[in-house]
């Protein structure tokens, strides 16, 4: 059966968005007409005008996402003839077993091994950038358990193929109405899984194993060779452990360098035309995800220029009261659909199926570098260069397994990329620490397209951050990296405009400059309460027709956001939480990310990779599920937040007192209202501040 996919334009949503753009633009124009007509009203007025110009600039960029939203669907992926399916490699990257629990990593590995895909066409690679003895030891045991698990899943067509998730209470509904053979086999595989977990737990307690080794030679080990699957045995995919060489003082280019190493190593061992990239804490939740992606990659209309299929990041541990917006609803349920209606979504850090050759050339000439300067582009390995050609099987024929492994050690060496185009024109770029986002941007600029699929059943599930510090560190990292791109020679306003559509350029410009929200909120957060405290009016008085323009912009923005939240299946409470966390992120993570990018630009700081802690603390999780903010470890971010919250609280009551005394209610009405609105949003933060203060005194 031929793969089938559909792309449906969301006509109602697009029409409403375009009408809103016209209406809101008229209101914004009215506001600025009023501001500039009264521009001589003092420095506070000028600062407020500048802040509003910044906000209007970002708002204008955002409208590109709303111009042509589409929804895609696939049909009959499970009916695709296995002979039609191309080879697929799965790349899973881990870096530190202390921050990325090794049991979570192994669940991701085992779930990938159990994908509904021909075993002889599937290969799973684990990149251990920490070179940890623990990870290498445990993956061998994972392969032993994996053979039982893959066999069990295939025999009974198990839908949830992450063992940890399958044996949890979430999957009780899947384990009913089965015969005795199933129950016996399930009991057997469960006992093996429990034994595996105990083994991992005991090994993790050994301090000599749970370490990161930053001075080491390269190591490539075939944990399980799919070619050795015997007749009548469970067919399990190729499983490979890779720890590239690392030496002190050498720039290893973080995750981008790790994936480029995997590209070379896998090029000799499996050389699949497509690969899936997964975060180490994100497991395969739907075994048909690869087949669904192939419904696009095998489509003759899309295939020649299609670089990647992107799935949303969905998390199993986000609560209904998602105070940190861990699910990133605005991105995955609004913005990505909007970009998909242009030439495709931005590449996320995980859950995407990418065409290997897209990283080596352009859609119209994928082999240009291979043909014109193979050694300069791809390095000195003749065997690897041979693997890039059309006759790969012929090129590698006659090489023994030991010879291939010896060559992979060379490909994983830290000096292999010296004087080559790796990291610039070949593979993932090293110009930005946000390797996937930047890679997707460059692919679009080369002429490639992408598609976005948001199926009803999540194809991949991960673990979201559940405390303030980790959530803000993540946003700070993204802001710094994206601002860095925005002010570089690859800025969407210069580099992209001549290579992709204006609308898509504006989408990327939004990602690059959304950190400027910090400027708007910092000015508003200081000037507005200060002027209220001093009795200086910054808005038209109550009853003045010009106030309707300001009120219109405010209400129009809130209603647009509310519509998007409700239409994506969320609640009013989710809308309120998003309003709050938007402000918090802007005056904390975006502010520090902006400063970090500026310091990197002038050379005061050097950009460094910050690994997010993925180990979940039960106490923090309990706070998160109760809707309480956790400020532990987030002192750096809390300083500007607490100062502005307390300042706004003091200025509101001080300004209200002054207004009552002077009876200038009409002049100060708008400022009092905005201050009260911010206080309402800030209430949970003030509550946590008071709670911590009481706890500190007791």
UniProtKB/Swiss-Prot annotation:
Glycosylation sites recorded in the entry for this protein: 38, 317
Highest rank taxon of the organism: Eukaryota
Tissues showing expression: Mainly expressed in flowers and flower buds and, to a lesser extent, in leaves, stems and roots.
Transmembrane segments: 14-34, 42-62, 478-498, 508-528, 546-566, 581-601, 636-656, 669-689
Keyword Metal-binding belongs to the record: no
Membrane topology: Multi-pass membrane protein
Keywords, comma-separated and alphabetical: Cell wall biogenesis/degradation, Glycoprotein, Glycosyltransferase, Golgi apparatus, Membrane, Transferase, Transmembrane, Transmembrane helix
Identification of the protein by name: Quillaic acid 3-O-glycosyltransferase CSL1
